[in-house]
Amino acid sequence: VRRQLAPKKPSRKSSRKNNSLNKNKNEQAGDIGAAILSHRSGGAHGVCKGGGMAGNTSHKGLDFAKAVALNIEIGVSSLAAFDEVNAIAGAKIHLKVETGMGRNGFSDEWPELLSRDLSKVVGVMMHFARADEPNEAQNKLQIENFEARIAELKAKGVNPIRHISNTAATLSNESAKYDMVRVGIAMYGMSPLGRDNNLKPIMKVRAKLVVVKELPAGHPIGYGATVVTKEATKIGIVGVGYADGIPRNAVGAGVTFNGQSAPLIGRVSMDQIAVDLGPNTEAKSGDWVTVIGDNFDIYDWAKACQTITYEITTRISGRIPRTYIES
């Protein structure tokens, strides 16, 4: 992102009042990417104003003119998209090139692209396949391929802004930083390389206890009765479930109430999870708990679900209202 984005409060109202997601408002710059044209311009989480860069655009039919009017520089990875954007007065284009990811980016169309009018090209980019494995030879090979493309552009009179580093490369590869970087998960205060004490997670998911009740020892919990209480205890039913983005296969996670951990028990339901609050808890129906954050952060949930932190952050559904706060 090349310029500051102006944050805005969420515009969508939710009928579910028993949960919320808090993020530092500056996070909005992190998910601009490919979704900006279809989602961010007047979308659910705010309006992009005053510039930025939308990347990874390979297909036609998006409202490129609106993006240009908002002073957004557009990344393209196909000849069809390039021709469409290049025809717009005032457009600024970033070319995405294929260097070894095997996904989108100019490859077979590259020679034909070089025959086009490149006067609106201001940047060139690529994406690493193995940036979270800093010592892999493929990273060096991709940089070499990228440098070859830069040389070809310069031979055509283009001196582009160069950017190739995602979060992993930004944190681990000094040689890959070039003119700017494109951090994603780091804007959430997380690292794909594991916990980083220099980064502070900014996203927190909270929900309310809809029921708190006592159960005797030997009582089954949830679908399939996969868990039975070992002793008399109080369980809390939290108003959030897999329809809200809480993975159904979570094992070993939990919530935080008044600084105390309450482990998840039983299977995650569509709209609810059950947690063991302990026999002496003072929790009551209507109290807030922290589902993601505090004692069970994104890393804990990712481990509990045998997945990556990216999946946990991106799967939080639109049923949960967003609140942006300043720290």
What residue ranges belong to the model's regions?
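Active-site anion/phosphate-binding pocket segments in diverse small-molecule metabolic enzymes
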Residues: 1-7, 17-28, 58, 78-83, ...
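Active-site-proximal beta-alpha core segment in soluble small-molecule metabolic enzymes
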Residues: 2-163, 177
